Amino acid sequence: MTNIRKTHPLAKIINNSLIDLPAPSNISAWWNFGSLLGVCLILQILTGLFLAMHYTSDTTTAFSSVTHICRDVHYGWIIRYMHANGASMFFICLFMHVGRGLYYGSYLFSETWNTGIILLFTVMATAFMGYVLPWGQMSFWGATVITNLLSAIPYIGADLVEWIWGGFSVDKATLTRFFAFHFIFPFIILALVMVHLLFLHETGSNNPSGIPSNSDKIPFHPYYTIKDIMGALLLILALATLVLFSPDLLGDPDNYTPANPLSTPPHIKPEWYFLFAYAILRSIPNKLGGVLALIFSILILAIIPLLHTSKQRGMMFRPLSQCLFWLLVADLLTLTWIGGQPVEYPFITIGQLASILYFMILLVLMPIAGIIENNLSKW
């Protein structure tokens, strides 16, 4: 009798995705981040569900309801901090996952890569809306500043902003709709993840060498299931350490003050994972230009496959490109630091230089390095 997991319509899908999936024999720990993102997503949906049971999306009670969760709900504090810090872990895994794709040339699977970019935008939108919900000072002013950026759109900008706000300022209507969207988006993300995996399984995984691995495949289970469980345990350990020892390490103290439309905080800044994009936005003195640079800083990923000049897929055997890649990582860390600094000398100049370098590396230097390396290899 044939095994049920190979015949049952539902079990067959799971089997072909997680058990009998042929996987390259040499994929490193950098390939763990996909499954870790799945763990993060499930964790966020579960903790978010329990938070939503006690949260109220009304401007008068939102802040108090979060306090109530932390003080009165059984283990409410750990659920709240797991959700808040889980978002940080989510973004750490996301950045590592995208970085892996850039380094090893995984972007040449264009459908998988493009669905990944859509996922990145959706996760960023979800995280932004979630940050508004506690209705602290930084929630309110962050929402005001970021939604206001849409007013830079010519002709329809001002109307668009009022339409999103549901009034003439960020108020009750805004909070309610942000809560509704924040609740539904993770399920949209879940559906997009299925599409992402569908496209990935059409081609199979890339591997560190960048050479097709069809001649050397191993079953996903038990080799990579055990490896993924190991990764998940390390992720949960890191998250637990963060939640139990320094839950407010990555947060903003301003968000412990209830939202007050009459008092602007001295430094408005988003969560740490948006700081690199925020720094790029701020480094351009023109409003529309800044907004375009902000969007393009993420959208640039979509044209990376078109800029691939090397005859090798990954950067494993390309020292010039490797240097540029790690320069890009250092540049992004610099931008993240600048995004959290006040708008004054020398931070403005550093931010502008780092922003120029970011676009230079991706649009100019990396394609040139690919051509140089081809010539060096006499190809």
Curated annotation (Swiss-Prot):
GO terms for biological process: mitochondrial electron transport, ubiquinol to cytochrome c. It is a multi-pass membrane protein. Heme b b566 binds at residues 97, 196. Heme b b562 binds at residues 83, 182. SUPFAM superfamilies: a domain/subunit of cytochrome bc1 complex (Ubiquinol-cytochrome c reductase), Transmembrane di-heme cytochromes. Binds 2 heme b groups non-covalently. One of its GO terms (molecular function) is ubiquinol-cytochrome-c reductase activity. Its main location: mitochondrion. The keyword rRNA-binding does not apply. It comes from the Eukaryota. Heme 1 (or BL or b562) is low-potential and absorbs at about 562 nm, and heme 2 (or BH or b566) is high-potential and absorbs at about 566 nm. The cytochrome bc1 complex contains 11 subunits: 3 respiratory subunits (MT-CYB, CYC1 and UQCRFS1), 2 core proteins (UQCRC1 and UQCRC2) and 6 low-molecular weight proteins (UQCRH/QCR6, UQCRB/QCR7, UQCRQ/QCR8, UQCR10/QCR9, UQCR11/QCR10 and a cleavage product of UQCRFS1). This cytochrome bc1 complex then forms a dimer. Component of the ubiquinol-cytochrome c reductase complex (complex III or cytochrome b-c1 complex) that is part of the mitochondrial respiratory chain. The b-c1 complex mediates electron transfer from ubiquinol to cytochrome c. Contributes to the generation of a proton gradient across the mitochondrial membrane that is then used for ATP synthesis. This is Cytochrome b. It comes from Melursus ursinus (Sloth bear). The gene is MT-CYB.
